[in-house]
């Protein structure tokens, strides 16, 4: 697949700054998948609905370790057998803001925004719920090359709170979308699409210069 079809990391950051959703594609030798990625600070019910409808995977909210400790979001399991070491916490819903069942696009967007609100406390969240926080490794993609860390990095680089919203992108038949299909999705919805490797290299270059 020609790289001409992909965007630069800088273009992706500008898109996140505008409150848009981007596509971040994994390395072929890792999960080999693409995720819709957005900044949690500007998430809306419309964006959640888009991600659920066109992503079809599990909508998750990457957060920093510090934020998860503050909200007492413990890991879902004490010891994981997941080879990717995806750090799921217990799922949550927000108690306030007229949240009802917790599963609607509106309810999930309210829960996500509540989690990054500095005034929210641990007891403001019910457990279990319908939003799945993920604990990101400190140091971003240079520490762990996951979509979890990439989402945090993109949000931070765009000037938002270090928290994201991600969902895996599947094809209509339920199979995982790979790069050729992901490029088509990006074109269809006019979204920026980048390889995670580009972002990792961008971070390495930045660290060498600073």
Feature names for model-found ranges:
Residues 1-210:
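Catalytic domains of riboflavin
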């Amino acid at each position: 697949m020609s790289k001409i079809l992909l965007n630069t990391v800088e273009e992706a950051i500008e898109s996140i700054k505008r409150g848009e959703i981007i596509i971040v594609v994994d390395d072929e030798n890792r999960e080999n998948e693409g995720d819709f990625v957005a900044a949690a600070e500007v998430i809306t019910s419309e964006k959640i609905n888009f991600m659920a409808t066109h992503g079809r995977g599990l909508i998750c909210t990457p957060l920093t370790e510090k934020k998860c400790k503050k909200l007492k979001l413990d890991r879902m399991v004490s010891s994981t057998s997941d080879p990717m070491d995806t750090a799921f916490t217990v799922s949550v819903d927000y108690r306030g803001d007229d949240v009802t069942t917790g599963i609607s696009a509106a309810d999930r967007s309210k829960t996500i925004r509540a989690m990054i609100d500095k005034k929210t406390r641990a007891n403001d969240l019910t457990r279990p719920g319908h939003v799945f926080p993920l604990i990101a490794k400190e140091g971003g993609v240079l520490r762990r090359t996951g979509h979890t860390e990439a989402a945090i990095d993109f949000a931070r680089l765009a000037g938002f709170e270090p928290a994201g919203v991600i969902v895996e992108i599947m094809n209509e038949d339920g199979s995982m979308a790979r790069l050729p299909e992901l490029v088509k999705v990006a074109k269809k919805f006019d979204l920026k699409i980048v390889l995670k490797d580009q972002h990792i290299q961008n971070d390495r270059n930045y660290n060498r210069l600073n």
